[in-house]
Structure formats: C-alpha cells, structure tokens
Design a protein with these regions (language model features):
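Structural signature for solvent-exposed beta-strand/loop edge elements and short helix-capping sites
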Residues: 1-149
C-alpha cells in the first residue's frame, strides 16, 4: 500500500508512507513516517521504519524512533535510535529503548544509552551513563532505577 496508508486492528492503527501488510499472518511493516497509535492505552510509537505483529502485540520502530504516552495529565516523550513495545497482557506493556535515549515530561528528564520500563511494576531502568534531572536535582551513575508509583 502506498500514499500514506493506514491499517486498523482493534484499538490500534498502523500508518506509513508505504505499508507491507499480511492479514493472514497478522503483521505489517511501515516505511517512511511510520506511526502506530493505540487509542485504548493512549500511546504512540513513531519512526521512519516500523514493524507490528498484531497477534503478539509486539511493535518495533527505528530511525528517529519516538514513543509518546499520554497519561497522568501529562505526556511522556521518549526518543532513541530503536524502540520496542510489547504487550505483556491486556493491561501491561514493556518498552525498551536502545542507543541515545532521551526522555522528558514536565517533572523529569533523562538521558542514557538504553532503558527499560514495565507498566506492571512501574519501574524504569536506565543503563550506561544515565543522567536524570528532576526540578533542581541531577542524579547520575552507572545504572539508575526509578520506582514510579
């Protein structure tokens, strides 16, 4: 499919300048300005290339990859070279970010090489030279673990 195509799957829509989609296998690839939106969980995954498997609910984005989560009256912006998003069950998901990770929302910002976040336990792991800023504080170390209630 060409010319800014869209593929709908339940609460999710895969958008791209061109899309290769196999309905029988339940997966698609998007090339150029890829966006995977999940309206139920209020998240968006973007990049210049992306892959989505609707059966396993696994998504991958690379080349200017960005993840946005609209929750708690604020938006979390996450940027990295490569992002993976996978559903653990109907309410929990895991996000992994690799290479040149940067994230921010109004109450905190951070940078690191790689990061992992699981919505089930709300623990954020920052790896390899992480730095976290919160108001006037700066935290750094070789690994940072954040418990986010």
């Amino acid at each position: 499919m060409l010319d800014r195509s869209e593929v709908y799957s339940g609460n999710r829509v895969l958008i791209g300048d061109s899309i290769s989609y196999d309905q029988n296998a339940g997966f698609g690839e998007a090339f150029g300005n890829m966006c995977l939106q999940d309206t139920a969980q209020k998240v968006m995954l973007e990049g210049q290339y992306g892959f989505y498997n609707e059966r396993t609910e696994y998504a991958f984005a690379t080349d200017s990859a960005r993840f946005l989560e609209y929750s708690q009256g604020d938006t979390l912006y996450l940027h990295a070279d490569t992002l993976e998003m996978m559903s653990i069950d109907s309410t929990a998901r895991e996000i992994k970010a690799f290479y040149g990770v940067r994230f921010y929302r109004t109450d905190m910002q951070g940078v690191c090489d790689s990061m992992q976040f699981n919505t089930r336990d709300s623990i954020l792991y920052m790896y390899r030279d992480p730095i976290l800023w919160n108001e006037q504080y700066q935290i750094s170390g070789d690994t940072i673990v954040i418990y986010m209630n």
